[in-house]
A protein has these predicted regions:
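An alpha-helical support segment within catalytic cores of ATP-dependent transferases
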Residues: 23, 57, 64-127, 178, ...
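Juxta-kinase regulatory segment immediately upstream of eukaryotic protein kinase catalytic domains
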Residues: 240-274
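ATP-binding pocket architecture of kinase catalytic cores
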Residues: 1-77, 339-342, 346-351, 356-361, ...
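Active-site Asp-x-Gly
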Residues: 122-124, 137-190, 420-447, 451-459
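Catalytic-loop of the protein kinase fold
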Residues: 124-126, 131, 388, 392-409
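Conserved protein kinase catalytic/activation segment
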Residues: 134-143, 405-419
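ATP-binding glycine-rich loop module of kinase domains
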Residues: 1, 273-275, 281-323
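Helix-rich C-terminal or lid/interface subdomains of diverse kinases
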Residues: 53, 57, 118, 161-241, ...
Length: 522
């Protein structure tokens, strides 16, 4: 194994590099370099879609490089070897007292596709290549670990453990396939992969029985999931697979787009250290740093992956947002520093605001935010109320305000509100049918074409925000973390009947403050 690790390391595979091997008492020791980082399996769901897919691409490309190491010429013919292995697994499955519902579909698929093994090449295999044997080091680079099950065989058989990758992150699994084949996946691959996964799945329950009923249940659920992916083994392309999206790197950071775009103009604002590319507005946002100062750049004009409409429409919407940030300048609103027609589009430049986002699209940040002490969340809500009251006084109605608009700086205790692009001046009428925004925070009138949108609409938004902050997004008394009076106040605000809500933000604030004075802190 040590020699094979040396060979892999010589190809530039990111891994624990072999340093030394020698005898130790009655055994053998090996010395390898240390990788300081996180298990990818543990953090993958906390990463953005872009990062998940990008790491999948990396994993596929690394595997392709690993497979450039040939198998020994003396290696047994693959067709004979793997047919023997499948026969053994089928026999063990039939002898096993526990069978899968629909398990015969795996056997039928194997028997109908054995011919695919004929003439398959053989190469060095990692032997256990999946997300559980990958790490992200402190520099953000993918690292491969645990080579102790290495083997030689069909390079495509190495994908048989992609089941575990797909269960954790379909985007990562898709990226792994696309990266390996450079985006051009041959149809034969899917047929063979289904064969290899069928073989692996058959052996899972016999393997699990010695480990107890809990492990057996895991394998039964996994088999059912595999059958659902492959439509009972009738479709060789699993349902989790995605062709992905175009990835472009800016200062070493990936972003997803519909196609290439020239972002060289960003260097006017320094080096990019963060990218936000999941907006459906058509905007793409960047954190940049120049001469020790940080900026938040919101840009319209690029072909963003999730954007609806054309880049030109996104530019027009962002241009409309410019006076909103100027008119609603407030101590808790992200500070606009300027705007510029640049790069074939429009950039709004803000001073950078540190903080964790409450939005559930950022799982790690969201969890940290929601673990804030009750007193801190109450302070955040006071800041939001202050901004909403100011918004109403300036003659605006808040459209598309949601948890993703709220940042909290754990160092300073400061609340920052951002992403108010769709706020509108009153009088305002619903001219879309379904207005921009998250349905969790939208009033009924924001779904009714021609309905009036006003301060009473924003009372609903404030009530929904209260339930997000103090009721775990639910609207039942059981989840509410404050007292009965404040619950009644918030419930009144989210009434479907506009006439039953508080009729102004000020009225809500006064009722809210009065309720808190009558309630003991938990």
């Amino acid at each position: 194994m040590f020699r094979m690790q040396q060979r892999a390391a010589s190809l530039g595979i990111p891994m624990c590099r072999p340093v030394e091997i020698g005898p130790c008492a009655d055994g053998v020791y090996t010395l390898q370099t240390w990788i300081d980082g996180d298990d990818l399996e543990e953090i993958i769901t906390e990463l953005s879609d872009t990062r998940q897919y990008a790491y999948g691409l990396d994993a596929g490309r690394i595997l392709r490089r690993l497979h450039s190491i040939p198998a020994p010429e003396s290696q047994e013919d693959w067709e004979s070897r793997f047919n023997r292995k499948m026969d053994y697994k089928i026999q063990k499955y039939r002898e096993c007292p526990i069978h899968y519902e629909g398990g015969q579909s795996f056997i039928d698929y194997i028997n109908a596709n054995r011919h695919l093994l004929r003439g398959r090449p053989q190469v060095f295999q990692h032997g256990d290549y999946h997300i559980g044997n990958m790490m992200i080091d402190r520099g953000g680079r993918l690292q491969i670990i645990d080579f102790d099950r290495y083997d030689f065989g069909d390079p495509w058989e190495e994908f048989n453990r992609i089941v575990w990758c797909a269960q954790k992150s379909p985007l990562f699994a898709s990226g792994m396939v696309n990266g390996y084949f450079d985006g051009d996946v041959p149809p034969e691959f899917w047929k063979l992969l289904a064969l290899y996964i069928s073989s692996n799945t058959l052996s899972s329950v016999p393997w699990a029985i010695p480990f107890g009923q809990g492990e057996v249940e895991v394998m039964l659920r996994q088999a059912a999931e595999v059958l659902s992916w492959y439509d009972g083994m009738r479709n060789p392309v699993p349902s989790w697979y995605s062709k992905g999206f175009y990835l472009q790197t800016i200062d070493g950071i990936p972003c997803k787009l519909k196609g290439p775009f020239d972002f060289s103009f960003l260097h006017e604002y320094g080096t990019v250290f963060q990218i936000f590319d999941d907006q459906d507005s058509g905007n793409i946002c960047f954190g940049t740093e120049r001469d020790g100062r940080r900026y938040f750049i919101k840009f319209a004009g690029a072909p963003t992956e999730r954007g609806t409409g054309t880049p030109a429409e996104a530019v027009a919407r962002l241009r409309t947002a410019l006076p909103v940030y100027r008119d609603l300048r407030h101590k808790n609103l992200i500070r606009l520093a300027g705007a510029k027609e640049i790069g074939g589009g429009l950039a709004l430049v803000f001073q950078w605001a540190d903080g964790d986002c409450m939005g559930r699209m950022y799982p790690a940040s969201h969890r940290r935010f929601m673990r804030l002490p009750l007193e801190a969340r109450l302070a955040v809500f006071r800041d939001i109320l202050s901004f909403f009251e100011y918004t109403a006084a300036q003659g605006y109605v808040a459209i598309d305000f949601y948890d993703g608009s709220i940042l909290y700086d754990f160092e300073t205790g400061r609340t920052t509100i951002c992403d108010i692009d769709f706020f509108r001046r009153q009088p305002c009428v619903n001219d879309m049918g379904r207005m921009w925004g998250s349905s969790r925070f939208q009033s009924p009138e924001e779904f009714q074409l021609g309905a009036v949108l006003d301060e009473v609409t924003n009372v609903y938004t404030i009530g929904a925000t209260a339930f997000a902050l103090f009721g775990e997004y639910g609207r039942t008394r059981d989840n509410w973390q404050l007292g009965d009076i404040s619950f009644t106040t918030a419930a009144k605000a989210v009434s479907d009947d506009r006439a039953r809500r508080q009729q102004s933000i000020r009225q809500f604030r006064e009722e809210w403050e009065a309720a808190l004075k009558q309630e003991p802190m938990n």
